[in-house]
């Protein structure tokens, strides 16, 4: 997947985004396309221009994107994500980004952000938001969903004992806590 940052407004699918996938899938050379990582809630947005799967109002635009890929004969999978400590919600300093452990993080653009240790309620909400995003993806007609858990984003932060210094059941000290 590529991160084109071609969404508009609050992460809505744009004509430019559709044009990008139309061009890339033209000719039917791809059996499967995994679209760029899309945020499951506003607190988990990794960059301006990232596609949203965080609201039911996103479904219509996502349907347009699915149709563009399906016209080429390709299957399409959505990649859903939460940026965790790398979230841009913290760039203006008014809030801190949610993360396994409160500590400084760096966004994908190199900006420093401060993160706070997620509460159990926040963890439960993120789990619910991933499930809701997957339902939206299904409603939009995608052929599958991939949960992004790499590149230092939230799930990867939980997997790493470097960024996960929790002392509860989500501890980064044990395999069980990280899974």
Regions found by a protein language model. Name each.
Residues 1-81, 90, 126, 134:
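N-terminal capping/small domains of soluble enzymes
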Residues 81-142:
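Non-globular sequence segments
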Residues 11-13, 127-131, 136-138, 170-179:
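Active-site glycine- and acidic-residue-rich loops that bind
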Residues 118, 146-179:
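Polysaccharide-binding and catalytic clefts of secreted carbohydrate-active enzymes
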